[in-house]
Amino acid sequence: MTVPEIFDVIVIGGGHAGTEAALAAARIGQKTLLLSHNIETLGQMSCNPSIGGIGKGHLVKEIDALGGVMAEAADEAGIQFRILNSRKGPAVRATRAQADRVLYRQAIRQRLESQPNLWLFQQGVDDLVLEGERVAGVVTQLGIRFNARAVILTAGTFLAGLAHVGSANFQAGRAGDLPSNSLAGRLRELKLPVGRLKTGTPPRIDGRTIDYSAVAAQPGDAPVPVFSFMGNAASHPKQVSCWITHTNSQTHDIIRSGLDRSPLFSGAIEGIGPRYCPSIEDKVVRFSAKESHQIFLEPEGLTTHEVYPNGISTSLPFDMQVKLVRSIKGLENAHITRPGYAIEYDYFDPRALKSSLETRMIEGLFFAGQINGTTGYEEAAAQGLLAGINAALKTQDREPWCPRRDEAYLGVLVDDLITRGVTEPYRMFTSRAEYRLQLREDNADLRLTEVGRRLGVVNDARWVAFNIKLEAIAQEQNRLKTTWLSPKSLSETDALRVIGKNIEHECSLHDLLRRPNVSYAELMTLPGAGEPVVDLAAAEQVEIQAKYQGYIERQKDEVARNAYYEDIRLPQDLDYKTVRGLSNEVQQKLNQFKPETAGQASRISGITPAAISLLLVHVKRGFSSANTKKSA
């Protein structure tokens, strides 16, 4: 049957990408349908029970600044919070939350069900409806047809998913869920560039069988951080510790003895796994000189005894999993509640996408999440948010929003995917961002909330709070710049305590704050400094902006210089074989990937600065058919 009502946007998949996509499209005001094979697993944390981390936390903050829900859900479900790299500079500091799986899923479900313009329906999707070269809807497993102007595919690991435990394998999207084989077959028929990737998960352990006296406690931070800019530590549930143990030589010997039974080394697994989250057998082989590997024992929630042993992802046979787990200190009597496994799945070359995450081949079809070759909840959610925004904008006949590399980690993520592609699952790190000093966690709202308001994804409450914060920052900066201390007004004791030496001439509080060893909190204890700003987030911004002002200005100058290439649009009908002087390799790559700007072209592997110069000369002369038409 065909459902008579037409949706603006249909989202396939209810994981981290799908939920953010559906919510974003609905917030913009478009009639949105979220299809999932099981409504009970919406927002499911399929692997590790945590949100954030280095690079990943930055994405979560950006999602939050744009009105997304991942940070809010993490605040409501987080049972331990830590700031990573807290002793390093603000550019690389990152928030990480250990989450209760059940509470996280509940937080996501509640937001989905209370979002206007959003409908949920429990059905897997078997087919896409195409009209010429554009998508027109989907067909579910029961043959129900839903029509839409845009479709977002967020299938995770479900496309032709195949799970492995030793020599055994079974079809699955994840343990306990069937794969989407019909949809995978349909996508392959469309001749989209497809490949196989692999990921894995460790065995789960009954916490009652762990000897906690033999492992080291890792408590969270105090005071407890919050993830969302709208968050409050009072909303956090009970806080608990994680625990740390290590593998040893016996563990490694057990793993080596079972490598011939590992699907990873027997050739049974074709997909390539994540470099930065390897299986324990991969770590033992690749780092053979290393005597031990750190294992984090992470509680799965407040109402379960299950523990997630982060660091021993494996697809070894179950009997080997039992041996390796029980060889680890504190786990000698551990009971495994669920075996670890590897899963391989279809992904599609993200170089076949536009910056908006719309496919180049099929108009109105968007991809987000692991289908694009990424790994991680945060990377998926960020893509889902962007795809949801752009799908909604497309149905409103508005221009897409494509964040730049200097604007957001989301911009770095998408640009890396569509210009460089992936040969292994892509995860975000701060090192991937060349402008990371201005892409900090702490200023994600200052960078993106105004953009989100213009796009329609930021609600009134967030907008009001954002403007109050902006005003507090501006007022405090002005106060510090106009409040002066003289050598006579500052005692030697106070000067040495806060500044480290006597001041020789009259200084503004802002000048003193720019000194590396002077903190805002200490500065406010000086006589005559006045009352500190009440908003701690505003105080943090005042201090960071003062201390890093020179560095940030230099980075902004660099961005401005490089913006020249980012602003030069390349005609999508340009045949690069007509550009004189380009090598055959460069012509082939440019024709294959069709970069949207000269900046994108410059980041494609094998494209030299000389090739970009030739390309710019060609475009400026108006040799493309598009430019010819404009001049006619």
Swiss-Prot record:
Positions bound to NAD(+) = 273-287
Q: Which UniProt keywords apply?
A: Cytoplasm, FAD, Flavoprotein, NAD, tRNA processing
For FAD, which residues are the binding ones?
A: G13, G14, G15, H16, A17, G18, V125, S180, Q370
Cofactor section? FAD
Gene Ontology molecular function: flavin adenine dinucleotide binding
Ranges in coiled-coil conformation:
none
Matches recorded under PROSITE patterns = GIDA_1 (PS01280), GIDA_2 (PS01281)
Its domain of life? Bacteria
What subcellular compartments does it reside in? Answer: Cytoplasm
Please state the protein's primary subcellular location.
cytoplasm
HAMAP family with a match to the protein in the record? MnmG_GidA (MF_00129)
- Name by which UniProt lists this protein: tRNA uridine 5-carboxymethylaminomethyl modification enzyme MnmG
The organism is Nitrosospira multiformis (strain ATCC 25196 / NCIMB 11849 / C 71)
Classification of source organism: Bacteria, Pseudomonadati, Pseudomonadota, Betaproteobacteria, Nitrosomonadales
